[in-house]
């Protein structure tokens, strides 16, 4: 769970601590357990990892049965896990406020069977729901809003062709498989700048189901995009 601190803290790892400081009755600090943290990954990588793990609790994800985010409308990211032969189950998840890791298993490993969903999710829901109660109460006050996950200012969003990885052209939208657009985040300076060189527009005979030739009736011809596949062979092929 401690490793996940770098995702929510813009790439800075913070070691777990059971206390921050101890003071006497006059407020004098007797023990100080402050920790500055260490840079483990870049801010951009931390943001991208959080974006990826935000999909896990959503519909279709391995933690889709998690109720916390739908109940409280607080940002959640995390990852489920399981050991070989389902001896152990995990869920480590975090919000902009706290990180919580849950392990489910036996002291002496044995198969965990007859469980439709990851049991760690219910425990995580209960624990995180309780410790976020003060945040939910604060949200009811005028002007108060929940914290949200930070997105690095050095990231840009870009739409590209999923076949070439380059910027879209009109041909990409005429692929027989449907629109080939994909949207992703990139570190500034690494986003695609060239245009797709894989899709090629051709005249297509919709009746014959093949590339049109000069004898095809004009009324049967439409334009479609085919993907140009570069083949490289170790030797010259005749």
Where are these regions (language model features)?
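A penicillin-recognizing enzyme superfamily signal
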Residues: 1-205
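C-terminal functional modules
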Residues: 194-238
